[in-house]
Design a protein with these regions (language model features):
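Acidic/glycine-enriched connector segments
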Residues: 1-151
């Protein structure tokens, strides 16, 4: 799945996408951010904007994940923190800010199931209502499909 995600990021870059926004969760968000930071080493026009739900997001993560997380933040272009402390809606607010600032949304979830959690489900609904194009990489089939309403037209 990581290889397919990197391939999709590189395809978007070839289509002149230079700015990537990531919510920096310990799963796909961290993988994507690390991949973008690696690409930035040879592509000075590429930018990574990290939208953190709150400052202590990684406090309870395993030490190896915290290490990767802080390295990723150190290497990114810009960090924006939604809240100083954890709030029930901070993750959703981070996703919404990303959606508002994006022309295209790239998601990773099992297209045969609902999104990973309530914040992710609400964020996907928000992207669709915002009429943003949404590309999804299915982590099991590795298929990329367009899931927004405009895909039907």
């Amino acid at each position: 799945m990581k290889r397919e995600l990197l391939q999709k990021i590189m395809e978007l870059r070839q289509q002149n996408v230079t700015q990537f926004f990531v919510a920096c969760d310990y799963g796909v968000g961290l993988y994507a951010a690390e991949q973008i930071n690696d690409l930035r080493k040879t592509d000075p026009d590429l930018m990574l904007f990290c939208k953190l739900p709150h400052e202590g997001q990684a406090t309870k993560w395993a030490p190896y994940l915290r290490e990767r997380y802080f390295k990723m933040l150190e290497d990114c272009t810009h960090i924006d923190c939604i809240s100083l402390r954890a709030q029930p809606d901070a993750q959703l607010l981070a996703y919404q800010r990303i959606i508002d600032q994006s022309d295209l949304i790239l998601t990773v979830f099992d297209s045969g199931a609902s999104a990973a959690g309530p914040a992710e489900e609400k964020a996907l609904a928000y992207a669709l209502v915002s009429r943003k194009p949404v590309l999804n990489l299915d982590p099991y089939t590795l298929a990329v499909s367009r899931i927004d309403k405009r895909a039907d037209k």
